[in-house]
Amino acid sequence: MHYCVLSTFLLLHLVPVALSLSTCSTLDMDQFMRKRIEAIRGQILSKLKLTSPPEDYPEPDEVPPEVISIYNSTRDLLQEKASRRAAACERERSDEEYYAKEVYKIDMPSHLPSENAIPPTFYRPYFRIVRFDVSTMEKNASNLVKAEFRVFRLQNPKARVAEQRIELYQILKSKDLTSPTQRYIDSKVVKTRAEGEWLSFDVTDAVQEWLHHKDRNLGFKISLHCPCCTFVPSNNYIIPNKSEELEARFAGIDGTSTYASGDQKTIKSTRKKTSGKTPHLLLMLLPSYRLESQQSSRRKKRALDAAYCFRNVQDNCCLRPLYIDFKRDLGWKWIHEPKGYNANFCAGACPYLWSSDTQHTKVLSLYNTINPEASASPCCVSQDLEPLTILYYIGNTPKIEQLSNMIVKSCKCS
């Protein structure tokens, strides 16, 4: 009896002490915003391996179209990936490389019929072949972080089937008659008659191989799931002995003659719609001087086991909006695009880790012994983050970089 009374007495006295042991001090929203803005300033410079902002130079009157094209493609790709992750309830990988990646765009080469060259595409009823020249990037083979193949699917109102499953293959160099001639990469179900859309495929392994072995670069093959039969995507049913042609049409691959034979007005309209939608590769490379820093000091992974489902209540931990205007908030003129972005931040109260009705003094004592400098109550921190693409100038040289973990999308108590 005396033991129970003593335990209760100690518990009531130790719990308030535990609740006060927090390294997360209460700040007003203005102070949160100021700290977040300064943190972003340091983040951007750090990720670009800059000790200070580049010197101010007069902004160019007009950014070259090819530079804008790379920026737009990279930005759109990131937005598409974010939308897919949100739809699938997936999170960005927490072990994303910290430093910024340089982005390069390689368009599919176009050859005139009169040129004595192998055309980059071949028309076949059941597949298309696409080739890229990546020889200029061979010296950077070891720095490749990611490669994406992007192709724009055109609307085909004359398609005989509404849906098709298309597959992407890497064409292999055959050593003998028994060796495989292609390697599967990915597949997508597309709506042939729907409005056009960009399709993206992760081709990092294939491009990495091409950069190290030039003779193995035989291109990609876009084909039907089963050209010798008919595949019904809605129920994964295959109808044998019924050939199905590739009804999906792709900008820069399928000629305008597919849509109009002799109709100059329609040909001109189609060319206008497909302008700027050439199939291309987006290569993301980590420069050597950043690669060395990345290998020497890896960031710690964010803990994922302490996630807290926060409520959207003003006083509780939740996502707070914060728009950063580079010129107004940071005093920077050297970032050309975007002019600003929604950085956001996390703030609010978190429920305490211990309470008098769920924990005992021995547990609290053990925790404090193991983690003497740790907070006894959780803090509101970021959980899901997304990258940001920027276009900036160093002198007269335009550069496009992808900065990881710059946009806070959700929060947790940890």
Swiss-Prot record:
This is Transforming growth factor beta-2 proprotein. Disulfide bonds join C309-C318, C317-C380, C346-C411, C350-C413. PANTHER family: TGF-BETA FAMILY (PTHR11848), TRANSFORMING GROWTH FACTOR BETA-2 PROPROTEIN (PTHR11848:SF141). One of its GO terms (biological process) is positive regulation of heart contraction. InterPro entries: Cystine-knot_cytokine, TGF-b_C, TGF-b_propeptide, TGF-beta, TGF-beta-rel, TGFb2, TGFb_CS. SUPFAM superfamilies: Cystine-knot cytokines (SSF57501). Interacts with the serine proteases, HTRA1 and HTRA3. Interacts with ASPN. Interacts with MFAP5. Residues 1-20 form the signal peptide. The keyword Transmembrane does not apply. Gene3D superfamilies: 2.60.120.970, Cystine-knot cytokines. NCBIfam families: DNRLRE_dom. The keyword Signal applies. It holds the Pfam family TGFb_propeptide. Keywords: Cleavage on pair of basic residues, Disulfide bond, Extracellular matrix, Glycoprotein, Growth factor, Mitogen, Secreted, Signal. GO terms for molecular function: amyloid-beta binding; growth factor activity; protein homodimerization activity; signaling receptor binding; transforming growth factor beta receptor binding; type II transforming growth factor beta receptor binding; type III transforming growth factor beta receptor binding. Glycans are attached at N72, N140, N241. GO terms for cellular component: axon; endosome; extracellular matrix; extracellular region; extracellular space; neuronal cell body. Belongs to the TGF-beta family. It comes from the Eukaryota.
